[in-house]
Amino acid sequence: MAGAKEIRSKIASVQNTQKITKAMEMVAASKMRKSQERMAASRPYAETIRNVIGHLALGNLEYKHPYLEERGVKRVGYLVVSTDRGLCGGLNINLFKKLLADMKSWSDKGVETDLALIGSKAASFFGSVGGNIVAQVTGMGDNPSVSELIGPVKVMLQAYDEGRLDKLYIVSNKFINTMSQEPLIVQVLPLPPSDDSELKKKAWDYLYEPDPKSLLDTLLRRYVESQVYQGVVENLASEQAARMVAMKAATDNGGSLIKELQLVYNKARQASITQELTEIVGGASAV
C-alpha cells in the first residue's frame, strides 16, 4: 500500500485538476449560451433562403442554373466543419467516422473525393489518415464571420463551376440540445428539391430583375455561403455543449477518485497508527 504522504499528494493533484475542469465547464457553459444566440439569430435566414431555393428548384425556370442540374458523378466534394480545440468528447471523431463511411461508399462506386476543411482538428485528422485536401481554414475563434469562410467555399464552388466536382456536401454537427449533437452530411449542390410535400403540389413561377442568370448566380452563391456559415455556428454550439458535458463528467470523476483515495489514505493512516501502537507496546514489554 502507498504511504500516507504519497496518497495526500495524489489527492491534492486530483483536486487541482478538478478545479481546472470545473472552471472549463463554467467557461464552456457561458460560451455555449452565446453560441446558441448566434445560432438562433442566423437560423431563420438560413432556413428562409433554403426554402426560397427549394421553390426555385421546383419551379419552371426561364434559365436552368448549373447548380440546379444533376449530372454524372465522378468526383464529390466535402466542406468539413470541425473544432479548433479538443476536450469536447467524441464530437469530432464521430463526425469523421460518418464522413469516412460516406467517402468509402463513393469510393466503392469509383468516385473520387475532395476535402475543404474548416477547423484544425479536421486538418490534423485528415493530414494523418490521408485525403485530397484542396483548402483549409483554422483559428476562426468563438465568433466566426462569413468572410473567414469565403476561401474554402470559393475553392469548392470554382471546382463545381469548372466541372471538376459533381456534388458538394457540408459535413458538420447539428445542435439538438445540450446533451445531444448529431453529425450530418447534407447535400448543397446540385440543389436538392425541397422535400416538403405541400410545396411539391404547387407550381412556382417567378419574375426576375434584372435577369434570371445574374440573379440566380448571386442568390445561389449566397445560399451556399449561408448553409456553410449555419453549419459552422451550429458546430460551435455543439462544441461548447460537448465540452461542458465532458468537463462536468471529468469533474464528477475527479470527485469519485478523491473519495476512493481518501479511503485508501484513511486505511494507510490507520495501519500506520496501529504499527506505531504495536511498536510502543512491544517496547514497553521489552522493558
Curated annotation (Swiss-Prot):
Q: What is this protein called?
A: ATP synthase gamma chain
Membrane topology per the entry is: Peripheral membrane protein
What is the role of this chain? Answer: Produces ATP from ADP in the presence of a proton gradient across the membrane. The gamma chain is believed to be important in regulating ATPase activity and the flow of protons through the CF(0) complex.
Question: How is this protein organized at the quaternary level?
Answer: F-type ATPases have 2 components, CF(1) - the catalytic core - and CF(0) - the membrane proton channel. CF(1) has five subunits: alpha(3), beta(3), gamma(1), delta(1), epsilon(1). CF(0) has three main subunits: a, b and c.
Protein keywords = ATP synthesis, Cell inner membrane, Cell membrane, CF(1), Hydrogen ion transport, Ion transport, Membrane, Transport
Q: Which Gene3D superfamilies match?
A: 3.40.1380.10, ATP synthase, gamma subunit, helix hairpin domain (1.10.287.80)
Task: List the subcellular locations.
Answer: Cell inner membrane
Signal sequence region: none
